[in-house]
Amino acid sequence: MKLLVTGASGLLGRAVMQECTRAGHEVIGLAFSRVSGALVKLDLTDAKAIHGLIQRERPDVVINLAAERRPDVVERDPVAVKKLNVDAPAILAQACAALDPPAYLL
């Protein structure tokens, strides 16, 4: 199965990628601020980039682990946090639904 993991540079994202790879899945990791190694840099607030990547890679499953969880950042920039925590998952859902067959979004 082909999996796409957002937030792949985080603690949970790295662990999920490792376990999915160990289970024999093809895994594509996405990150934005701490991109290294085989991770793909993607701005999840860029709808066009999200749709393009999902159309190009055609994953079976997208595992969304990207989020801003620090309260001080939420208070300092609630608009940016909403884009990542609310708007980006909606865009991911639309992009997954546009595939034929559609990808599952977790």
Features from the language model and the residues they span:
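Conserved beta-strand positions in the Rossmann-like core of class I SAM-dependent methyltransferases
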Residues: 4, 28, 82, 106
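Conserved Rossmann-fold NAD(P)-dependent oxidoreductase catalytic core, especially the SDR/UDP-sugar
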Residues: 87-106
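Rossmann-fold cofactor-recognition segment
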Residues: 32-48
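N-terminal Rossmann NAD(P)H-binding glycine-rich loop of SDR-like oxidoreductase domains
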Residues: 1-23
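Conserved glycine-rich Rossmann-like NAD(P)H-binding loop of the short-chain dehydrogenase/reductase
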Residues: 11, 25-35
